[in-house]
Amino acid sequence: MLFRQVEFSFINVPPSYLVPAGTWQIVLAFAFLLVVAISEEVIFRGYLILRFRTLAGNRTAALLLSSAIFSIGHGYQQSGGVIAVGILGLVFGLVYLWRGSLLAPMVMHFLQNFIGIVLFPLGMQ
């Protein structure tokens, strides 16, 4: 019964009113998504992984906790979106731990958002 009430979808196409119309809106979307990617990576990878690693003394636990919080913060994307975001959070976190820099996760995060929120919906029109 519960599973019938939970919508499960990995592909969440933004509503048409959120899809940029015209060059100016695409430029604004680019800037907005760049700020989102940078700020979320600084918070969830740059800050939380370091804090949780200090508290737990374990980088695996820090990565899992940070990714779980990142995922829960995207709860508006329904269950499939939360799972997908959790997986992306793990990938971004692994890249951060591997490279020791936020630059690669920031670029990956921005590209994922821009393709999914701007380019993919524009291609469907």
Predicted regions and their residues:
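Functionally important transmembrane alpha-helices
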Residues: 64, 81-125
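Residue-level hotspots within pore-lining transmembrane alpha-helices
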Residues: 35-40, 83, 87
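Juxtamembrane helix-loop-helix connectors linking adjacent transmembrane helices
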Residues: 1-36, 54, 125
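Short, motif-level signal for alpha-helix interfacial/capping segments enriched in acidic residues
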Residues: 14-23, 53, 78-94
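Membrane-interface helix/loop boundary segments of multi-pass membrane proteins
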Residues: 39-65, 94-101
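Aromatic-anchored segments of alpha-helical transmembrane domains
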Residues: 1, 67-75, 111-118
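Residue-level signature of transmembrane alpha-helical entry/exit and packing/kink sites
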Residues: 25-29, 59-63, 81, 85
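Short active-site segment of divalent metal-dependent hydrolases/proteases
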Residues: 40-44, 77, 112
